[in-house]
C-alpha cells in the first residue's frame, strides 16, 4: 500500500505544479498584444496575490500548456486509481480473500447469489480511461493551433466525458 501512497504523493505534486504555473497575472495582455491603458502590472500582481505578471502577452493568450499539464496530471492520477482498484478487486476475490468489501457497496450476481461483485471498484477502473482520451483529444486539437485566441478549444472534450 505504501507504493500507492508514493504514487499519490507524486500526483499531488503534479496538481500543485499546475496551480503554481497558473499563478501569473494576465491583466493587461488584452486579446493579443497588450493594452494602451496605463496599467501597473506589478501593482495589480501584488493586489491580486499573483506570484508575478506574465512575461509575454501573445504567449499569455496563446498558451494552452496548462490544459495539457492538468489533463496529464489527471491521467497519471487515473492510472494510479485504476491500479489500486484492480488490486482491491484481486484481493477481494475468492482466490486471495485478503480484504472484505462491505455488503453496502457490492452487488449480488443474478446467477450466483453468494457472489459479491465489487461494482464501485470496477466502475472506477473502467472510468479512468476517459482521462487518457481527453488528454489525447486536447493534444490533437492543440497541435496546429496558431498564436493568439481561437475558438478551436470549444471542441475540447466535455468534463463529463
PLM feature segments, named:
Residues 1-144:
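Internal glycine-rich alpha/beta core junctions
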Residues 154-161:
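Conserved small/polar residues in nucleotide/adenosyl-binding loops
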